[in-house]
Amino acid sequence: STRKESSAASDVYKRQQMLGFFHPTQLFGTGPIEAAERVVALETQIASHHWDVVASRDSLKTYNPTELGELPDIIQTLLTASGLPEGRVIVMMPSFVDKLAELLVSVPLTDWKLWAIWSILRSRAGVLREDVGAANFEFYGTVLSGATEQRDRWKRGVALAESLVGEDLGKAYVDKHFPADSKAQMLELVDYLVDAYEQRISTLPWMSPETRERALEKLRLFNAKIGYPDTWRSYEGLEFSREGGDLVANVRAGAAFEHDYQVAKVGKPADRNEWVATPQTVNAFYNPVVNDITFPAAILQPPFFDPAADAAENFGAIGAVIGHEIGHGFDDQGSRYDGHGNLNSWWTDEDRARFEELTAKLVKQYDGLVPTVLEGRGESRGVNGEFTLGENIGDLGGLGIAVIAYKNYLAEQGLDPRGPVQTFHAPGATAEIDGQEFDGLQRLFLAWARVWRTAIRPEMAEQYLAIDPHSPAEFRCNVVAGNIAEFYEAFPEASAEALVAEDDRVVIW
């Protein structure tokens, strides 16, 4: 309670400080304190009508096809003014849209103007005067995230350029940092993971033959995007001023170009070859509406992937991530989409019920877990097992399937996962880690652990619990490994103090 009140007070102070850069005449006769209070009051009203994080990720609740002409008049006006053509739209939160329409009419126009000024100032603070950027960082960087200093100016500059012309930078990144043979190796790993999923789905005890065949059909339709797009995006028509130009004007030009680019897609068939991220993004993605997985070039480096590493390490790191992303196609939300990306009920009711029995156990395992960095710091909300369910299913399936894939890889060569050095395009790899020798299965789990070694500030950890559908890194590592039988096979001593009690362990995929 005290912490919330402190945060709310900081929120008002932050806006007061930022709005203080304006002359009162620019704030419609209000001073910065009153303006800040009115902005926060309006934002609070808007936020109160948002759905919670669990409902917001529900693919059925958020799929509400509606004709533009059926929306409240003022919402139609706003969308039309933004360039959206007539036709069908998907309304994710119908009740929120209705309440927003009411606020647009009932809240004084001056409050909306102040809110617009604040929103623009906040979004452009990083490219305005140094004192504006510093004031913005003081709250969003220090108060909310715990950071003590801004990133170097050149790093902020690169991030800005990436936000405006990301794929152009991606070309240069790929040319310099992405070896051609990495793509071939990744595709080989993907094949091993897909085959392992097919093997597991074919023998699932809780799934009926009818649903099993549809799941295998979806798996066969998966597409993998590795490294970089086959066709680069064109930025033709986007013009920036050069030396001595106006930085804010350049940012506005980039934002307008991106807006027009996105609006132009409306009403047209989805481009299944388009990428959801730039090659220099350190992340991986599953896109349910096109049923594909994406692995940008930048994630294909240690600790996730190393073309010169031991097979166990690549299966335990990037292999588990591949399995995680494929697993999103079969998590609590992704499983509602068919192999062509359509929201379609392809499960029998009985299979869906059995699936939800298993996922309920997983929710229970994670619910309320408090990350180490927040222990002893007063009341913490802890992990929300429902909110993080999709990512936890992905993690659990990803590592479990990676173990199967690794065993299959070794079996093809007549090798034993409990034996010494087993390599994958890596003649110089070693079984030693920090001077101690481990067998293949052990090295796979150690690679998984290495991926999740993380340092995080308490402020950021608390923020992530509220907004991030992923569990904290320590639980992504330990809870997942604790559910997998091969972990205790690899480390028998772990059974004495099991990470997850044997009767509570969950295997879904």
Where are these regions (language model features)?
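Noncatalytic, helix-rich "gating/capping" subdomain that lines the substrate-entry/channel surface
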Residues: 1, 6-10, 14-192
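Zinc-dependent metallohydrolase catalytic domains
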Residues: 187-319, 326-509
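Amphipathic alpha-helical core segments of compact helical bundles
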Residues: 162, 166, 170, 323, ...
